[in-house]
Amino acid sequence: MSPGRDCTAFLQWALPSLQRSWPGYRRVRHLLCKRLAQRLKALGLADLEAYRRQLATRPDEWRVLDALCAIPVSRFYRDRGVYGALERRVLPALVETAAHPALAAWSAGCASGEEPYSLALVWALRLQPRFPDARLRIVATDSDPEVLARARAGRYARSSLKELPEDLRVQGFEEKEDGAWRIRDRFRAVDFVQQDLREAMPDGPFDLILCRNVVLTYYAAPLRDLLVTRIAARLRPGGALVVGAHESVPPGVRELVAWRGARMIYRKRAAGHSGD
């Protein structure tokens, strides 16, 4: 069997034990195989069969393997249509229907901070002038302390900003001497917290939650469904949940319905309301 097939067979065997979904990892399997090769080298193991034996005799290694399966891929303004819908439909509706002037948003699985900072830019530069009395508090969580450190630093390669509209890039960033682009201080009011979604979540309630390309892609049922239910419980009635481009909410989570005219966005039904 070739090394690639060996790795695929190993992932198909190991991922279910971590309550992770092999189909979700199919497109990024080469990244995981590269990480596994590095881990084998660090342990001085000859092949994946030896690593299987290591997992059998050293249960703590499963935690290491689980960490290797984290996919911190993100970029600014990922899925332009989502941010357009948030700007034109969702956030204005949340402001206009809120019983309070301060909205709360949560970016779940925020990686290096591109998503929460994109939201902060859209809010401050596009929506705050329309709603001067409203405020938006943003909490962002991830399980990886290294990516959170990069998020707090707020420094990015020019390539990660390529999808960001020009006005947001010009007003939101300053180019440094080393070629990095640093988000300006006025847009850095994001509360970054290290949390593993499987173990803890912010209390909420939130008006807006972004959970894209994490739970619904990489976790297997029933853990996936349980996490989505817990996430939905942290949404205010009428609040919005944003998912990834190829994701959909499990049908058993009945309190979430598609937000009309806003692809990839769900709305939480009001308590006791059964219609759309």
Q: Which sequence ranges carry the predicted segments?
A:
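Conserved beta-strand signature within the Rossmann-like core of class I S-adenosyl-L-methionine
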Residues: 237-245
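A short glycine-rich, Lys/Arg-flanked "PGG" loop and its adjoining helix->strand segment in the class I
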Residues: 225-237
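Conserved SAM-binding loop of SAM-dependent methyltransferases across substrates and taxa
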Residues: 112-130
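Conserved AdoMet
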Residues: 2-106
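Conserved class I S-adenosyl-L-methionine
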Residues: 100-117, 137-139
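Core SAM-dependent methyltransferase catalytic element
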Residues: 250-276
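Extended basic-aromatic, gly/pro-enriched interface segments that bind polyanionic ligands
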Residues: 108, 129, 134-210, 214-223, ...
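A structural alpha-helix within SAM-dependent methyltransferase catalytic domains
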Residues: 87, 120-124, 232
